[in-house]
Amino acid sequence: MSKVIGIDLGTTNSCVAVMESGQPKVIENSEGVRTTPSVVAFTEDGERLIGQPAKRQAVTNPDYTFFAIKRLIGRMMDDPTVKKDIDMVPYKIVPSDSNDAWVQGRDKKYSPSEISAFTLQKMKETAESYLGEKVEKAVITVPAYFDDAQRQATKDAGKIAGLEVLRIINEPTAAALAYGLDKGENKTIAVFDLGGGTFDVSVLEIGDGVFEVKATNGDTFLGGEDFDMRIVQYLADEFKKENGIDLKSDKLALQRLKEEAEKAKKELSSATSYEVNLPFITADASGPKHLNIKLSRAKLEALVEDLVKRTLEPCKKALKDAGLSPSDIDDIVLVGGMTRMPKVQEAVKGFFGKDPHKGVNPDEVVAMGAAIQAGVLQGDVKDVLLLDVTPLSLGIETLGGVFTRLIDRNTTIPTKKSQTFSTADDNQTAVTIRVSQGEREMAADNKLLGQFDLVGIPPSPRGLPQIEVTFDIDANGIVNVSAKDKATGKEQQIRIQASGGLSDDDIEQMVKDAEANADADKKKKELVEAHNGAEAMIHQTEKQLEEFGDKVPGEDKDAIDAALTELKEVKDGEDLEAIQQKTQALVQAAMKLGEAMYAAQQTEAAEADAKSDAEGDEDVVDAEFSEVDDDKKKDA
């Protein structure tokens, strides 16, 4: 049975882990790094780059380098958070046919699920390379505060990447699993998870292998990206004051600012000041302009103070829902790269009244927890029971647009709940069930997850028909809803899919595209390797010809020259087979050069030995000696 892997699909970075000898192990990628940037790029020549190679070329290819795509997953174009992002990223966010937020690639529009799938493919390949076997199943993490549409879109991404997603698990819960795997004592912990694009806080009770989430809260549009943007805004404003040029309207400059902002933010976690130095950032009629601004830690903290404060309100709500006070928390586990910021650690300590626990790697702990959950599902990890919750209340729209809750937030999942409703008008033969998720009292203020019709209700006075609505949330936090007319037994049900979202046909097509691209990528890689091999062989042969060409018989030299010419003719082409054949032909022809080289070396070695022997004879000194017998030696 193939291994089930755990993947932390992050906003900024992603990470993959697997269980080995009862412990989670984070796997290094092909670059030898344990985390991979969640960045995907499409180059001018049609190549698709993922991870560090994509991030490295972002400055020269800002329109088609996609980062922080997780902030768009499962969202509509009219979502206020999407509108905010449109102004802040250099790539184009465009509407799909169903008004979902997608991105514009070079050749077509891509859904955030597709872009995320490319990162998941990289994680899958990383695991396969390490394990030496095919990987087909995974546990993938999402922010605890992700709604149904976002969870479904993440599951779709896994499917497009060729993975069967056995479970979607909340990031703070995964972190708690990794933190508490070997801890026997009973504890109440808070997981404070501030990542690249999202913030979550979860309160859990752990002990004897049981991990029970008591409450969760968060903000799916608060993370490191927002901190970076504050620095970008500040640098752009300072530059404009001095030079009268708005760098934000220049995509290239904006990308350079973003990279430098991220670097400054990281440096200022340990240093007290950082010199932002960007030569030739732009130019005007007077010539090139350079940006040179000193940023202190104090200034950075002032710029992001309100963002740090925004993390505390969800903490209050989570504790209130759990019926606890800050002093009831035994340990605070910090997750996400942003928790390295001293100001964030200060805020956590101030709120909970104690120093946070720093025994876990904030960048890797979520993937490790996902691997543990994968081990549980595979049967490799025993005596671990995970009880998670739904982050938001679920209900339907009733008369007057009121949001009627069927399942309250922080209800343990999986769960099932039914409630009976009736008609609003006389002789009503159909009802529309509008399913929403959120905490507001009016349905219109909450997130509409989907709607469906129950038809064929016998005409009756209003209030008489009995329609039973059932909500069923699975362990992934994904919702199924059914409505049944008790009189006729007629039933209608749907697996909730956002009014946009990807249909099964869309996903199937994307899976096919991904598979086709995987083949194309493989061929492209083989072609690049063949080009490189041909270049290396040509260079090596020409160098050897210069040194030893005169020692090779004429006909052999002609054969080598002919093979060289033939390889040069095809080496830059697209015919992989021809390049490989001609390279091999040159390898065979060049063997004569190798023979000549060895013959020359042997001749030189023999001459050197002969010379050494001759010189040795010249240095011989004649000496007289007399033999002393043993008896004389004893007398001496």
Swiss-Prot record:
Disordered as annotated region, ranges: 600-636
User: What is its induction?
Assistant: By stress conditions e.g. heat shock.
Which residues get modified to Phosphothreonine? Answer: T198
Question: In which residue ranges is the amino acid composition biased (Acidic residues)?
Answer: 615-629
Which PROSITE patterns is this protein grouped with?
Answer: HSP70_1, HSP70_2, HSP70_3
Regions crossing the membrane: none
Keywords annotated in UniProt? ATP-binding, Chaperone, Nucleotide-binding, Phosphoprotein, Stress response
- Molecular function (Gene Ontology), one example: ATP binding
Question: What Pfam families does this protein map onto?
Answer: HSP70 (PF00012)
InterPro entries on file: ATPase_NBD (IPR043129), Chaperone_DnaK (IPR012725), Heat_shock_70_CS (IPR018181), HSP70_C_sf (IPR029048), HSP70_peptide-bd_sf (IPR029047), Hsp_70_fam (IPR013126)
Family listed: Belongs to the heat shock protein 70 family.
Q: What does this protein do?
A: Acts as a chaperone.
Q: Which PANTHER family match?
A: HEAT SHOCK PROTEIN 70KDA
What is the protein name given in its UniProt record?
Chaperone protein DnaK
